UniProtKB/Swiss-Prot annotation:
GO terms for molecular function: DNA binding; DNA-binding transcription factor activity. PROSITE patterns: AP2_ERF. This is Ethylene-responsive transcription factor RAP2-9. GO terms for cellular component: nucleus. It is found in: Nucleus. Pfam families: AP2 (PF00847).
């Protein structure tokens, strides 16, 4: 006994003259860009960060940022204050540079204070990255390195 299966149509029937187009890609992140934990990209290009409170269903909104790095650093700040030094971070080497000296570790801080600290770090990182980009844009490649103090 031979059982024959019909092949599932991969494309809907197309009338003559119709042009099939590919569906727009929802994922706007390029394949070579690293995905960070705790962040996502809005349709219009802003990056947002949020974190779930331990043992609760509620989330702490950490803000929206121009860059993925700023949103990820805001997330790192929040997760560090919520879970302590054992937390898995996007940028483990940067956490102490952000002024997270250890006060309020392990859930001692209120969600409002965590949100405030994370927003400060994210905004600072966004500002630093914007300043870096401006400096690169203003760099005159026709000048000699000595003109820049190099």
């Amino acid at each position: 006994m031979v059982i024959q299966y019909k092949r599932k149509q991969e494309f809907p029937m197309v009338k003559e003259g119709m042009v099939m187009t590919e569906k727009p890609k929802r994922n706007l992140i390029s394949s070579n860009e690293k995905r960070y934990k705790g962040i996502r990209m809005r349709k219009w290009g802003k990056w947002v960060a949020e974190i779930r409170e331990p043992n609760k269903r509620s989330r702490i909104w950490l803000g929206s940022y121009k860059t993925a790095v700023a949103a990820a650093r805001a997330y790192d700040t929040a997760v560090f204050y919520l879970r302590g030094p054992s937390a898995r971070l996007n940028f483990p080497e940067e956490v102490f540079k952000d002024g997270n000296g250890g006060e309020g570790l392990g859930g001692d801080m209120s969600p409002t204070l965590i949100r405030k600290k994370a927003a400060e770090v994210g905004a600072r990182v966004d500002a630093e990255l914007r300043l870096e980009n401006r400096m690169v844009e203003n760099l005159d490649m026709n000048k000699l390195p000595e003109a820049y103090g190099l």
